């Protein structure tokens, strides 16, 4: 394992605490009113108050910046945690006696202090109880080497876990406050909301905005009811026991009919919507709007129809192109097949030619007379090679003709020599 620098002397945190907290490893017995002993429940120690009996370890900055703190003594593979190293050792299948620690050694808990003198965690009273924690703290606060850089926002991180957490929220708004600040961590966002001044002044403004919005909605509802289809409704408070009544107006009257309700005399608010005086103007306006809507709809339908035709033409052209590509691929495959067949025929013709020449040479070697052999070698060289389409029978007949001529000439030469 890699050696690490400890403090010159093993410090006891009891000397730095005025009132040391009780140890979490021991359970105190408190007497109750009857004198019986009651076991005190163990409480979790708050952050920054380590165990007073723990061993204080001070590591050098070089050791804290190392990526692999624990190294296997068998294969020299490094790990960041001791638990990972112990799990790795089991894979080597080493006998348990070699891995078992000596029972005489007393295992003490260790706490780690920051080597930076100006840091809060340099004091043993605020030491960190985890090696990974002190390494992350030193890299975040006291190291300028930011190894992991975000490709989107070019923000650098010295700790890989912080970089991975940033990647999950990078490119999004994250947790945004009303003051404009954006937080990637929920904890930081909650802490900021507790101290944000903009959020405190928001409820009163929000209530005022709700009141204004409620008034606006009521006004819009009244104006919408005035522009209804009939234009002759008069809405008032309906009292129980009084049915709705409609007054029938003669045809000569131009005013539209209204609904009559008994009015309330106790001073309550009455919402009464009367028809507008310019009823003819409203009718003409609605007709003109309807005409414009029809024109707009016709234009939209025409454009959509043109777009549909264009899309159909494009689809048809795409299909035709695809069909032509398939035909070209088939023709190319057929051409490749014809070429391979032609190559095979040419190879067969070459083989036939070589076989014929070999047989002719073998026949000429059987002639015993040296003069005749030289005499017939020259005409054989001048004979053109057989065409590629000749078969084996033609080459054989040619070789037989050469043999017969050679035999005849040999007999004539022997007769001359004997005479």
Swiss-Prot record:
Zinc fingers, CCHC-type class: 175-198
Composition skew (Low complexity), residue ranges: 213-230, 246-259
Spans annotated as Disordered: 1-58, 200-259, 298-318
Zn finger (C2H2-type) location: 70-92, 112-142, 148-175
Principal localisation: nucleus
SHR-binding: annotated segments: 185-197
Binding site for Zn(2+) 2: 177, 179, 192, 196
GO cellular component: nucleus
Induction or repression: Not regulated by auxin.
Phenotype of the disrupted gene, per the record: No visible phenotype. Accelerated growth and slightly early flowering.
MF (Gene Ontology): DNA-binding transcription factor activity; transcription cis-regulatory region binding; zinc ion binding
SMART domains: ZnF_C2H2
Single GO biological process annotation from the record: positive regulation of auxin biosynthetic process
Subcellular location, record wording: Nucleus
Chain coiled-coil ranges: 313-349
UniProt entry keywords in alphabetical sequence: Coiled coil, DNA-binding, Metal-binding, Nucleus, Repeat, Transcription, Transcription regulation, Zinc, Zinc-finger
Distribution of this protein across tissues and organs: Expressed in cotyledons and the vasculature of reosette leaves. Weak expression in hypocotyls and floral organs, but not detected in roots and inflorescence stems.
TM annotation in the entry: none
Residues annotated for Zn(2+) 1 binding in this entry: 150, 153, 166, 170
Entry domain remark: The coiled-coil domain (311-350) is involved in dimerization.
Described function: Transcription factor regulating starch metabolism by binding directly to the promoter of QQS. The IDD14beta isoform attenuates the transcription factor activity by competitively forming heterodimers with reduced DNA-binding capacity. Regulates lateral organ morphogenesis and gravitropic responses. Has a redundant role with IDD16 in directing leaf and floral organ morphogenesis. Involved in the establishment of auxin gradients through the regulation of auxin biosynthesis and transport.
Subunit structure: Homo- and heterodimer of IDD14alpha and IDD14beta.
The protein's name in its UniProt record: Protein indeterminate-domain 14
Organism annotation: Arabidopsis thaliana
Lineage of origin: Eukaryota, Viridiplantae, Streptophyta, Embryophyta, Tracheophyta
């Amino acid at each position: 394992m890699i050696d690490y620098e400890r403090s010159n002397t093993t410090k006891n945190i009891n000397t730095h605490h005025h009132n040391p907290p009780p140890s979490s490893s021991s359970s105190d017995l408190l007497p109750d009113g009857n004198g019986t002993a009651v076991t005190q429940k163990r409480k979790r120690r708050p952050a920054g108050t380590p165990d007073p009996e723990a061993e204080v370890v001070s590591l050098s900055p070089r050791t804290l910046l190392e990526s692999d703190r624990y190294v296997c003594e068998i294969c020299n593979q490094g790990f960041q945690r001791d638990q990972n190293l112990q799990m790795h050792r089991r894979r080597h299948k080493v006998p348990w006696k070699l891995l078992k620690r000596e029972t005489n050694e007393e295992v003490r808990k260790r706490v780690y202090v920051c080597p930076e003198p100006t840091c809060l965690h340099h004091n043993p009273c605020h030491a960190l109880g985890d090696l990974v924690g002190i390494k992350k703290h030193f890299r975040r606060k006291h190291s300028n080497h930011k190894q992991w850089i975000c490709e989107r926002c070019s923000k650098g991180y010295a700790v890989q876990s912080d970089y991975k957490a940033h990647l999950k929220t990078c490119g999004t708004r994250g947790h945004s406050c009303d003051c404009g600040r954006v937080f990637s961590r929920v904890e930081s966002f909650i802490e900021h909301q507790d101290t944000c001044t903009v959020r405190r002044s928001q409820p009163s403004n929000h209530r005022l905005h709700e009141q204004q919005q409620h008034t606006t909605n009521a006004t819009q509802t009244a104006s919408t009811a005035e522009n209804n289809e009939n234009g002759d409704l008069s809405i008032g408070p309906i009292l129980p026991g009084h049915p709705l009544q409609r007054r029938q107006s003669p045809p000569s009257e131009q005013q539209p009919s209204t609904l009559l309700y008994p009015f309330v005399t106790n001073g309550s608010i009455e919402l009464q919507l009367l028809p507008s005086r310019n009823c003819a103007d409203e009718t003409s306006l609605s007709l003109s709007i309807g005409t414009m809507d029809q024109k707009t709809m016709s234009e939209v339908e025409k454009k959509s129809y043109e777009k549909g035709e264009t899309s159909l033409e494009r689809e048809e052209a795409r299909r035709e192109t695809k069909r032509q590509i398939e035909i070209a691929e088939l023709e190319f495959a057929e051409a490749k097949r014809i070429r391979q067949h032609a190559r095979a025929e040419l190879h067969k013709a070459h083989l036939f030619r070589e076989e014929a020449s070999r047989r002719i040479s073998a026949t000429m070697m059987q002639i015993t007379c040296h003069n005749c052999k030289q005499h017939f070698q020259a005409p054989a060289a001048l004979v053109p090679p057989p065409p590629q389409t000749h078969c084996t029978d033609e080459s054989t007949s040619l070789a037989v003709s050469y043999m017969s001529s050679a035999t005849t000439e040999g007999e004539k030469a022997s007769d001359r020599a004997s005479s």
